[in-house]
């Protein structure tokens, strides 16, 4: 069910990050070197999840693995135990909650019209539903963390934190972000471009779907430009 996927990705997946933030308060704050294996594992796990996204043919599986990769960055930022790292992790959890929920919503919009989640069978939607293609483009750009979205702010904070702690981590971070951009563009091109494989009548999009997407994406830009809205 699409509602379950949206709640799972937006809220329940972030409970792990919240639990780590709570537990880190009772651990020593100065000895971050002892957490080095966990930080490396978190970044390496993010890269492996991103590589798994590249070979997915199921749309919902691709979005789910994308959520896992972003949580790797959150864990790495929390473990370093700096104010910037904590701020970046919390901001990324909020931003990715909106983004992944929006992507699952778009995947359901596509599924309701094609009755399949296979990428190669959902292509050509830019000819049929151009407004939905616009929402897909915006959601994927936010997943890549382009400015002026909250995703960009959070990943910038996390990159600064990790680079200050250990400059070598920028290699793993850069590789992770490169793969994220690759599978996000691959997802967009696979679902929207190319010839349409459908021969039947496609139902047009409804106002509620456009409203739902607007309520997902507008807060990401508003919070990034005016963070005092939630602080």
Swiss-Prot record:
Residues spanning the signal sequence: none
| Protein location | Mitochondrion membrane
Question: Which Enzyme Commission number(s) are listed?
Answer: 7.1.1.2
The residue ranges crossing the membrane are: 1-21, 34-54, 61-80, 84-106, 128-148, 169-189
Tell me the Gene Ontology biological-process terms attached to this UniProt entry.
ATP synthesis coupled electron transport; electron transport coupled proton transport
Its Gene Ontology cellular component terms are: mitochondrial membrane
Membrane topology type:
Multi-pass membrane protein
Question: Top-level EC class, please?
Answer: translocase
Instruction: Report keywords, A-Z.
Output: Electron transport, Membrane, Mitochondrion, NAD, Respiratory chain, Translocase, Transmembrane, Transmembrane helix, Transport, Ubiquinone
Per its record, the protein catalyses: a ubiquinone + NADH + 5 H(+)(in) = a ubiquinol + NAD(+) + 4 H(+)(out)
Keyword Zinc-finger listed: no
Where it mainly occurs, coarsely classed, is mitochondrion
Q: Which InterPro entries match?
A: NADH_UbQ_OxRdtase, ND/Mrp_TM
Q: Which GO terms describe its molecular function?
A: NADH dehydrogenase (ubiquinone) activity; ubiquinone binding
The UniProt entry's sequence similarity note says: Belongs to the complex I subunit 4 family.
The record describes the protein's role as:
Core subunit of the mitochondrial membrane respiratory chain NADH dehydrogenase (Complex I) that is believed to belong to the minimal assembly required for catalysis. Complex I functions in the transfer of electrons from NADH to the respiratory chain. The immediate electron acceptor for the enzyme is believed to be ubiquinone.
Q: What is this protein's name?
A: NADH-ubiquinone oxidoreductase chain 4
- Write down the species: Atropoides picadoi
**Lineage of the species this protein comes from:** Eukaryota, Metazoa, Chordata, Craniata, Vertebrata
């Amino acid at each position: 069910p699409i509602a379950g996927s949206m709640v799972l990705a937006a809220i329940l997946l972030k409970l792990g990050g919240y639990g780590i933030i709570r537990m880190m308060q009772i651990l020593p704050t100065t000895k971050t070197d002892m957490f080095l294996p966990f930080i490396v594992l978190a970044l390496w796990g993010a890269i492996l999840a991103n590589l798994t996204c590249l070979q997915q043919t199921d749309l919902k599986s691709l979005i789910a693995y994308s959520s896992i990769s972003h949580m790797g960055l959150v864990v790495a930022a929390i473990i370093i135990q700096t104010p910037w790292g904590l701020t970046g992790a919390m901001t990324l959890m909020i931003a990715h909650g909106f983004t992944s929920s929006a992507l699952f919503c778009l995947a359901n919009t596509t599924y309701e019209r094609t009755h399949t989640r296979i990428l190669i069978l959902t292509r050509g939607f830019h000819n049929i539903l151009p407004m939905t293609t616009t929402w897909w483009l915006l959601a994927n750009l936010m997943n890549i963390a382009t400015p002026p979205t909250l995703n960009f702010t959070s990943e910038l904070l996390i990159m600064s934190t990790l680079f200050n702690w250990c400059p070598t981590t920028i290699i793993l971070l850069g590789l992770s972000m490169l793969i994220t951009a690759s599978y996000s563009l691959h997802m967009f091109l696979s679902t929207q471009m190319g010839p349409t494989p459908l021969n039947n009548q496609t139902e047009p999009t409804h106002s509620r779907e456009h409203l739902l997407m607007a309520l997902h994406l507008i807060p990401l830009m508003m919070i990034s430009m005016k963070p005092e809205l939630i602080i």
